[in-house]
Amino acid sequence: MALRAKADVWLARPWQCLPRTRALGTTAALAPNTLRPFEAIPQYSRNRWLKMLQILREEGQEGLHLEMHEAFRELGPIFRYSMGRTQVVSVMLPEDAEKLHQVESMHPRRMHLEPWVAHREHRGLSRGVFLLNGPEWRFNRLRLNPHVLSPKAVQKFVPMVDMVARDFLESLKKKVFQNARGSLTMDVQQSLFNYSIEASNFVLFGERLGLLGHDLSPASLTFIHALHSVFKTTPQLMFLPRSLTRWTSTRVWKEHFEAWDVISEYVNRCIRKVHQELRLGSPHTYSGIVAELMSQGALPLDAIRANSIELTAGSVDTTTFPLVMALFELARNPDVQQAVRQESLAAEASVAANPQRAMSDLPLLRAVLKETLRLYPVGGFLERILSSDLVLQNYHVPAGTLVLLYLYSMGRNPAVFPRPEHYLPQRWLERNGSFQHLTFGFGVRQCLGKRLAQVEMLLLLHHVLKSFRVETQEREDVRMVYRFVLAPSSSPLLTFRPVS
């Protein structure tokens, strides 16, 4: 099923039809042999005052990905602009991602996420790896990797995720069979949100929250609301100076801080419980990432708490939205869905015996996730502050420049992905390029929760699709909006019908 971006008609036009447009992906071959200076990079002029007004009116920058996509079409695969005193260079080709990776230092630097940092500073809390730079970042990251990202760690926590995914399936079956029509039509987004929290919390703290049932406790509802609030308020605060928003966005700052306070206190309670149970006797079986970190003394307690806060907040929306869009695209592409179902049914015995086999025995389903994230990259863009000079598209880019790599535009570039408007998971079964699937970043600073997110999505889809056909009447594309992560502006209605 072809995607047609109704919100912006220009997305459907040929790439060379606009004035000043260059053939993306071929510009490097057409560039002169002599190195060109930074000042020669095409400059993009943003209407700063209009953007500021939109943000102050709490519209945020919901169309940021589309604005940048249009800029690439007009200016080519590289352009620059100023963000306050910061020089920003935007790129969107795999070759530039590879160059960024090649010059990475031992301490790859990111921008400070001002609203999140402000909360930690005001509350006297440590920062985790998402907010750290420099040697402190490396110290934390090297001690977290073996417990969160390594194959050995994945082998330990996969059975926990599988248990939650199976419980989600049983909950869905119960809802379907209670319906007189023998099927269920629903907005599945909140259910998937609850699944992501349940699975992540179980893996982190070894504790189930009971979010897959009908009656949630007031404490659970407060916690869920806080997670939503953090991502809602972040883009309203991150694009303006704190000195301005402290006066113009007082209510938003208050909501942002209160949401983080709820999450922080929740994590503190979980850590206190894990600590007490470890003091009373070490568990005989694996009981989650935090218990492993504490029992092995891998990090100071403050660092464990700081990284647990970030993992708790960051492991929910980033899993939920790709799951929503994967189910939606499979519903719009029943032939692809049937092929995935056949694969899951064929692998059912091996995955049931060892859930980790899902990572190797379901190649088409893994391709579905890659194709979904090509079209709907949850992060939108990757960022690096250059530690040394670099040449991008034959332009000199000096050290200290902020470089943004836009995944949304890369995924829709026909020079990188032929027929980008088509949902074709099978393209990933034949591709070899390692810098084309970058949703989880690259290099030593790739997403810490990458493996956990992949396992959560893979097992959930495996269990649901082998038991249910997913259908929809909606044929129009879902409009995506930038809310710190790329999210659907509205969740499509999906019908779950038991496989006969």
UniProtKB/Swiss-Prot annotation:
Transit peptide start and end: 1-24
Tissue specificity: Adrenal gland.
Q: Per the annotation, which location comes first and is thus the protein's main one?
A: mitochondrion
Q: Where in the cell is it found?
A: Mitochondrion inner membrane
Superkingdom is: Eukaryota
- According to its UniProt record, the EC number is 1.14.15.5, 1.14.15.4
Q: Which UniProt keywords apply?
A: Heme, Iron, Membrane, Metal-binding, Mitochondrion, Mitochondrion inner membrane, Monooxygenase, Oxidoreductase, Steroidogenesis, Transit peptide
Q: What induces it?
A: By low sodium intake.
Catalysed reaction equations from the record: a steroid + 2 reduced [adrenodoxin] + O2 + 2 H(+) = an 11beta-hydroxysteroid + 2 oxidized [adrenodoxin] + H2O; 21-hydroxyprogesterone + 2 reduced [adrenodoxin] + O2 + 2 H(+) = corticosterone + 2 oxidized [adrenodoxin] + H2O; corticosterone + 2 reduced [adrenodoxin] + O2 + 2 H(+) = 18-hydroxycorticosterone + 2 oxidized [adrenodoxin] + H2O; 18-hydroxycorticosterone + 2 reduced [adrenodoxin] + O2 + 2 H(+) = aldosterone + 2 oxidized [adrenodoxin] + 2 H2O
Which cofactors must be present for this protein to function? heme
Give the residues the record marks as binding 21-hydroxyprogesterone.
Answer: F381
| InterPro entries, sorted | CYP11_CYP27_families, Cyt_P450, Cyt_P450_CS, Cyt_P450_mitochondrial, Cyt_P450_sf
In its UniProt record, a GO molecular function of this protein is: heme binding
Question: Binding residues for heme, per the UniProt record?
Answer: C447
Any single GO BP term:
cortisol metabolic process
Membrane protein topology class: Peripheral membrane protein
Identify the metabolic or biological route this protein is part of.
Answer: Steroid biosynthesis
GO cellular component annotations of the record: mitochondrial inner membrane
One Pfam family this sequence matches: p450
Q: Which family does it belong to?
A: Belongs to the cytochrome P450 family.
Q: What does this protein do?
A: A cytochrome P450 monooxygenase that catalyzes the biosynthesis of aldosterone, the main mineralocorticoid in the human body responsible for salt and water homeostasis, thus involved in blood pressure regulation, arterial hypertension, and the development of heart failure.
Q: This protein is called what?
A: Cytochrome P450 11B2, mitochondrial
Its ancestry begins with: Eukaryota, Metazoa, Chordata, Craniata, Vertebrata
Corresponding gene?
CYP11B2
